[in-house]
Amino acid sequence: NAKKVILEMADRFEKMTGRKYGFFEEYRMEDAEYAVVIIGSAAGTCKAAIDHIRHTTGKKVGLIKIRVFRPFPEEELAQALSKVKAAAIMDRSEMFAATSGPLGAEVRAAMYQAKLSAEVVNYFYGLGGRDITVEDFEQVYDNLEKMAQTHVVEGMYSYIGLRER
């Protein structure tokens, strides 16, 4: 069972270094109503946005940074998302003939299997090497709040930083 081995190794690593690892990292999720699910270094930018939003508006926003994609931690992730009203799944790549990116497909499946009712949207970012900013994440959280209030999701996915002609 790969999940068991991953957690055992994470525990050993924590005992050696004091650094905690697992399937994913949760940031300010203890009371979050709106969450971003992401993989990679853009999570640092998202953390800055979360701190700014919480400090200036008091909105309860959080982040889940995926560390292990296979085996996908569907039950654990569904538990972490069980109390949010809306979630944004951030992908850096698209999949052909699909309505989401690779991470989006996995997170949606996990939420569906757990019968979670949160509104969900998939965002594609960083295409063409473009950076994602704190302001971009602030807009994502604003959109999540609107989705949760209106129960209207304008499309299953959207693009951030895409240059239009």
What are these regions (language model features)?
Residues 1-25:
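Conformationally flexible catalytic loops at phosphate/diphosphate-handling active centers
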Residues 8, 16, 48-63, 112-113:
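Short helix-loop-beta junction
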Residues 31-59, 72-77:
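Redox- and metal-dependent alpha/beta enzyme cores, enriched for Fe-S-associated oxidoreductases
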Residues 43-46, 70-73, 95-97, 128-130:
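Flexible loop/turn segments at secondary-structure boundaries
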Residues 76-98:
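A structural-propensity feature for long, helix-poor, extended segments
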Residues 91-165:
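Peripheral docking tails and interdomain loops at the edges
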